[in-house]
């Protein structure tokens, strides 16, 4: 056996001068990147005033302080006295707490699925699988991908019963009972070996458990997320209620989209209900973190690897996709498992890992079409590893590679074949003009969310101007990636090893391609763990070659993690109150929903009183709780929403309700500043329905038919009756409570060119906004666009201006300044009901006011 020294040796065994020069040059490059990154971070915080935004609700901040105090009281004594018990105690307490909060069935259902998936994946990987925690995570994701495949077909058949899935999940466990015992013993042994000897290791482990505990607490809350209640929880609930999925693309526009994650949620939902689905999502995060930790251990000692895993877990986006049922945790875990299988192929030459990578890639594509760039970029690396072990793969390696490609196609294609068979569009509802479907007007094109140019500013903007890339607050992307991305690219110059190279190319390349197509920050979530891996490699290099740089990177990591923790709720609007105070209380879920999502309780009341009756959700997409026939006035039911928009007279609206057999309506209570689209629908509901139940701003009403043949009576305009108080100098967004809206207005957070991404708009004549201020000048901010009309401006009851907001091209944050005598004043902006001949509408919007 020969040993090949990787470096030329000079006198006394010292590296040659050229090698030293290269190391020094690379160290200087890393130092320059760190210095530039820190400077950009400081500039971003100063320019963006991020700490001035309302990240936490007051009660949320109090709960965070309580959580920190409780964690320290519990963790510090354990860390000092018996640190080897810390991991086991944390897992035990989490298990007991989960059972108390969600009931025993939910965690048992998730545990059954995970053990079954791990057993199935381990059997597929061979008789001598890797029983380490990252190895078991890989096997679990492989088994999950296998379960996703048949569920694509079974979901549409009436075979989905709890007993059926309990038996199906039990089969791999029974067939591999010895392996299950061995893996459980290996897990127990791993816990015993987590001794946390050094203080650095203890601190890193504590940080990881701390932030995972925060995600666990929000995962225990009832679902309140719009996407989940409209689709990702609705699918499991529908399947459990009818034993098959009854959603069809003729009405539900998303009914044939990729649903790999939803199939996993559906399996556990049948056994443990909603809580099981949410816990399965959290379990996918744990699996992802375990694999990321395993990848970091290739270059780092345990303390630093734990810190890298914790850094990813602190990313605010993690709380967004873990605190509500999104698909991103499942997708990211499948993608990282695919990459881990490719690495194992390179290390072992075992063709089973090639097949595993293919199945995992197919599972990722079945979960989200956005996985395509990740899979495409991974294929060359899998091919390279197969080429390196060409003779070892099998006696017929070419056939083996063809089988792998067929496995990928076979596991990925069914979702898109079903979509094509049902709609004539494999990507329905997108690309409708290229693949015309009978369910959409051929001129319609469903637009995706955000479209920002990808350039050298993108990384800075997505970090500090996150509102342009996500319906969230600035700073919600995570502060580490401004450093990680350039460090990962720089690492390609000096870090040896294909794992770091493949992770960097696939992660950063897929993120670039995705942002060019749709710059929604959530869509590159699956690339973030991959981008973290080459950073771990760079960190490992500095540990060996520059301790000063290593300590600087560790310090940056800790600071970024701390900032991320503070900004965790910035990634959405659902968890700014942190955990629910009723988590462990009897009927705590309903008590939480009373103020967080009262429409869910109104829908339950409808289910109890009118099972089987058809209901229209007038301004909501929460169909997860509906057990009868449901229509939505939203883009999720595109044709329904279009039909309602076109029904501008009573006979047409009444005809729709008769055609759909709608007898009940759930709608928000009419109030000042809240608009129901189209406005005629509000008039119809006010005149033609009778109130039956009201809770938390939502009403259940019965269609009476009393106004049949009559035009709806006009309803007095709702007026904001809150007392007005003059505000001082500053900029006030349209969502600020200092603004008082009268009449029907619609508020949106999804306008990327607007101030803070928010706009409030209406075309109702007479509707207005009042704003009291104390100053010498006030500026009205608005948007000029193709469908704008005139806005009449009055100050202290005196007419000041009539502004034409029309422009053939959108002009964001347009301004009109008015000077007044110093002191308190009130400005009013009202919809004039007039427009220029070229305008397509008479809309008026409010983007904010600036007081001087």
Regions found by a protein language model. Give the residues of each.
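Membrane-embedded, hydrophobic transmembrane alpha-helices
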Residues: 2-192, 514, 653-654
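Hydrophobic, aromatic-rich transmembrane alpha-helices
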Residues: 70-81, 209, 287-293, 383, ...
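Membrane-interface transmembrane helices that cradle and orient dolichyl/undecaprenyl
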Residues: 125, 338-353, 388, 539
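Membrane-interface helix-loop-helix junctions at transmembrane boundaries of multi-pass membrane enzymes
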Residues: 193-201, 297-300, 304, 349-352, ...
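Signature aromatic-anchored transmembrane alpha helix within multi-pass, membrane-resident enzymes
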Residues: 201-208, 352-359, 375-379, 397-409, ...
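Membrane-proximal, lumen/periplasm-facing interface regions of secretory-pathway glyco-
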Residues: 223-234, 553, 557-605, 621-623
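Short periplasmic/luminal acceptor-recognition loop of GT-C membrane glycosyltransferases, typified by
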Residues: 591-634, 664-670, 701
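Glycan-recognition surfaces in beta-rich domains, encompassing non-catalytic CBMs
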Residues: 708-852
């Amino acid at each position: 056996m020969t040993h090949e020294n990787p470096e030329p040796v000079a006198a006394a065994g010292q590296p040659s001068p050229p090698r030293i020069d290269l190391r020094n040059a690379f160290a200087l490059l890393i130092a320059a990147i760190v210095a530039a990154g820190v400077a950009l971070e400081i500039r971003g915080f100063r320019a963006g005033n991020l700490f001035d935004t309302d990240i936490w609700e007051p009660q949320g901040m109090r709960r965070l302080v309580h959580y920190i105090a409780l964690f320290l009281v519990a963790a510090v004594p354990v860390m000092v006295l018996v640190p080897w018990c810390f991991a086991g105690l944390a897992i035990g307490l989490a298990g007991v707490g989960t059972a108390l909060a969600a009931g025993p069935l939910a965690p048992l259902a998730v545990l059954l699925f995970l053990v079954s998936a791990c057993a199935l994946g381990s059997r597929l990987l061979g008789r001598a699988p890797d029983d380490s925690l990252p190895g078991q995570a890989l096997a679990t994701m492989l088994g999950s991908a296998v379960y996703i495949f048949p569920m694509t077909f079974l979901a549409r058949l009436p075979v989905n019963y709890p007993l059926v899935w309990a038996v199906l999940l039990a089969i791999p466990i029974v067939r591999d009972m010895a392996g299950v015992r061995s893996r459980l013993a290996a897990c127990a042994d791993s816990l015993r070996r987590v001794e946390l000897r050094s203080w650095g290791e203890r601190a890193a482990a504590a940080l990881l458990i701390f932030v995972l505990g925060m995600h666990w607490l929000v995962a225990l809350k009832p679902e309140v997320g719009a996407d989940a209640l409209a689709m990702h929880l609705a699918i499991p609930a529908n399947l459990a209620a009818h034993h098959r999925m009854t959603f069809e693309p003729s009405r539900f526009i998303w009914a044939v989209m990729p649903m790999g994650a939803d199939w996993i949620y559906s399996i556990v939902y049948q056994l443990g209900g909603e809580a099981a689905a949410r816990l399965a999502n959290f379990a996918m995060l744990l699996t992802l973190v375990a694999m990321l930790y395993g990848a970091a251990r290739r270059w780092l000692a345990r303390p630093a690897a734990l810190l890298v895993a914790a850094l990813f877990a602190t990313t605010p986006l993690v709380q967004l996709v873990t605190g509500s049922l999104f698909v991103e945790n499942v997708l990211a875990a499948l993608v990282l498992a695919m990459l881990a299988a490719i690495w194992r192929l390179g290390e072992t030459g075992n063709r089973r890992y090639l097949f595993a990578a293919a199945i995992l890639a197919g599972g990722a594509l079945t979960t989200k079409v956005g996985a395509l760039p990740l899979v495409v970029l991974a294929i060359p690396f899998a091919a390279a590893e197969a080429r390196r072990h060409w003779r070892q793969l099998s006696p017929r390696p070419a056939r083996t590679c063809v089988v792998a490609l067929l496995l990928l196609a076979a596991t990925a294609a069914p979702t898109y074949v079903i979509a094509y068979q049902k709609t004539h569009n494999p990507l329905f509802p997108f690309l409708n003009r290229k693949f015309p479907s009978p369910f959409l007007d051929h001129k319609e094109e469903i637009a995706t969310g955000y479209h920002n140019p990808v350039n050298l500013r993108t990384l800075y903007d997505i970090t500090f101007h996150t509102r342009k890339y996500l319906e969230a607050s600035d700073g919600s992307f995570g502060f580490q990636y401004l450093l990680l991305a350039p460090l990962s690219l720089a690492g390609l110059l000096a870090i040896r090893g294909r794992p770091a190279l493949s992770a960097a190319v696939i992660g950063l390349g897929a993120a670039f391609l995705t942002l060019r197509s749709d710059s929604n920050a959530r869509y590159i979530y699956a690339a973030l763990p991959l981008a973290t891996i080459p950073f771990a490699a760079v960190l490992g290099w500095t540990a060996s070659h520059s301790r000063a740089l290593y300590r600087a990177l560790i310090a940056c990591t800790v600071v970024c993690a701390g900032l991320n923790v503070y900004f965790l709720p910035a990634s959405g609007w659902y968890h700014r109150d942190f955990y629910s105070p009723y988590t462990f209380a009897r009927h705590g879920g309903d008590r939480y929903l009373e103020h967080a999502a009262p429409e869910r309780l109104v829908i339950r009341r409808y289910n109890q009183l009118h099972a089987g009756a058809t209901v229209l959700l007038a301004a909501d997409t929460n169909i997860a709780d509906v057990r009868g026939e449901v229509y939505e006035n939203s883009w999720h039911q595109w044709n329904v929403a279009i039909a309602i928009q076109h029904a501008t007279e009573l006979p047409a609206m009444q005809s729709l309700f008769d055609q759909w057999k709608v007898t009940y309506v759930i709608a928000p209570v009419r109030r000042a500043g809240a608009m129901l689209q189209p406005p005629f629908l509000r008039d119809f509901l006010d005149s033609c329905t009778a109130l039956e139940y009201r809770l938390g701003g939502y009403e259940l009403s019965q269609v009476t038919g009393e106004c049949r043949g009559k035009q709806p009576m006009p309803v007095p305009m709702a007026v904001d009756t809150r007392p007005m108080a003059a505000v001082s100098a500053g900029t006030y967004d349209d969502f600020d409570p200092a603004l008082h809206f009268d009449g029907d207005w619609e508020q949106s957070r999804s306008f990327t060119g607007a101030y803070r991404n928010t706009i409030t708009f209406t075309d109702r004549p007479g509707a207005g906004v009042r704003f009291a201020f104390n100053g010498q000048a006030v500026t009205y901010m608005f948007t000029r666009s193709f469908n704008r009309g005139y806005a009449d401006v009055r100050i202290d009851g005196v007419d000041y201006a009539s502004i034409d907001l029309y422009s053939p091209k959108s002009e964001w944050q347009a301004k009109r300044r008015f000077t007044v005598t110093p002191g308190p004043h009130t400005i009013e902006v009202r919809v004039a009901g007039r427009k220029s001949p070229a305008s397509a509408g008479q809309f008026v919007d409010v983007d904010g006011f600036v007081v001087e």
